[in-house]
Regions:
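Extended, solvent-exposed, non-transmembrane regions
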Residues: 1-315
Length: 315
C-alpha cells in the first residue's frame, strides 16, 4: 500500500529532517532466485511532517512469510524548539522456513536535536521482539536499549564518549569470551575504538544475548545448523563531518551529521532449506541541524532563525 502523508505545521528551524523505514526485504539465491524490494517503504521529506505505510500479508512460496505490518516516520518541532524525528517499523507473524518465527517485531527510535546543538539524543523505547521462537523453542532475549546512554554533555560526540565506548567494548568482550567462538565471529566482534573514531562508524546491538536457542549463540547472533545465522537488533552509528564553509574564526570542535541505522532481524540463510538474506523491521531516523556562525544568538521557540526569511518575504 502506498504511503499516506499528513502535513504537520512546520517551523523554519534550520533543521533538515531525514528518516527511512521499511518492513521487509529479501534477496534469495536458492532454491529460487528472487528479490523482494523494501516493503512499506516510507521516506520523510526534508521539511518534516508525517508519513505512514502499510504492508499487506506476504508469502514467498514456503520460504518466508509475514502477516503484515506498517511503518511510520515523523519530523516536527518540539515545545522547547528542538527538532524531533521518529521512525517505526512493525512486522507481525513472521516465518522463515518454519524454523524462525515471531509474533511481532518492532523497531522504533526517537531522536531530538536540541536548539543550538548538532548531536541528538536518542531513544529506542518500544523496540522489541515478541515470542521469538526457533524450531518451536522459546528464545529469551536480554535487551540493551540504552547502549548509547544519555546524550553526551556539552554537545560532545558519541564517538568521544567514554561511556558509549565502555558499553560497546563490554558487549564485544562478552562475545569474545565464549567458548568455541568461530573465526568469523572473532573477526567481526573485535572492538577497536581508534578504528571506530577514524572510520566514523560504530557497530553494536540492542541485544546483549539470548538463551534457550538451539545451535550456538554469540551475543545477539544465533547460528543454526542447516539454516543459517540470525542477527538481532543490529545498530550502526555513523557520523560525517559537516562542510560549514569558510569561517571567520576557528571552532574548538568539529560539527558532524549523525546517522542511526537499526535493523531488528537479519537472516543469512546458508543451510539446507535456502540461501540468501532477509531483513525484518528496518529504520534509519536522522536529520541535520544547520548551526549559525559562532556568536549568533539562537532563536526562541517559534522564532525564525537569524538569516532566514520570513515566509511573506520569500519570492
Amino acid at each position: 500500500m502506498a504511503a499516506l502523508a499528513n502535513e504537520l505545521p512546520m517551523l523554519d528551524t534550520g533543521h533538515v529532517y531525514d528518516a527511512t523505514a521499511y518492513v521487509f526485504s529479501a534477496e534469495l539465491q536458492q532454491p529460487i532466485q528472487r528479490t523482494v524490494g523494501k516493503q512499506s517503504l516510507v521516506e520523510l521529506p526534508e521539511k518534516g511532517g508525517y508519513l505512514y505505510g502499510q504492508a499487506e500479508p506476504f508469502r514467498l512460496e514456503g520460504i518466508v512469510s509475514h502477516e503484515g505490518g506498517y511503518t511510520q516516520v515523523a519530523g516536527y518541532q518540539g515545545s522547547d524548539g528542538g527538532a524531533i524525528t521518529v521512525a517505526t517499523s512493525v512486522v507481525e507473524g513472521l516465518n522463515v522456513l518454519d524454523v524462525l518465527t515471531a509474533d511481532r517485531v518492532v523497531a522504533q527510535m526517537t531522536s531530538e536535536h536540541p536548539v543550538g546543538a548538532s548531536v541528538p539524543s536518542v531513544s529506542f523505547l518500544g523496540t522489541r521482539v515478541e515470542n521469538l521462537r526457533i524450531a518451536g523453542q522459546k528464545i529469551e532475549i536480554d535487551p540493551h536499549l540504552d547502549i548509547l546512554g544519555p546524550k553526551p554533555k556539552g554537545d560532545e560526540s558519541y564517538f568521544n564518549d567514554g561511556g558509549v565506548f565502555s558499553r560497546i567494548a563490554h558487549q564485544y568482550a562478552n562475545i569474545k569470551r565464549m567458548a568455541g567462538l568461530p573465526q568469523w565471529a572473532s573477526d567481526q566482534f573485535n572492538w577497536d575504538p581508534a578504528k571506530a573514531q577514524s572510520q566514523n562508524q560504530m557497530n553494536c546491538s540492542l541485544v546483549n544475548g539470548v538463551s534457550g536457542a538451539p545451535g550456538k549463540s554469540y551475543g545477539h547472533v544465533i547460528d543454526i545448523p542447516f539454516f543459517g545465522k540470525i542477527f538481532l537488533a543490529e545498530l550502526t552509528v555513523k557520523r560525517t563531518p559537516v562542510n560549514a564553509g569558510p569561517r571567520l574564526e576557528p571552532v574548538k570542535t568539529e560539527q558532524y551529521n549523525y546517522r542511526f541505522i537499526l535493523q531488528m532481524i537479519r537472516v543469512e540463510l546458508h543451510g539446507g532449506g535456502a540461501h540468501g538474506r532477509i531483513i525484518f523491521a528496518y529504520i534509519d531516523p536522522n536529520g541535520t541541524t544547520q548551526l549559525p556562525p559562532p556568536g549568533t544568538p539562537m532563536p526562541l521557540p517559534g522564532q525564525t532563525p537569524p538569516g532566514k526569511k520570513q515566509p511573506q518575504d520569500r519570492p
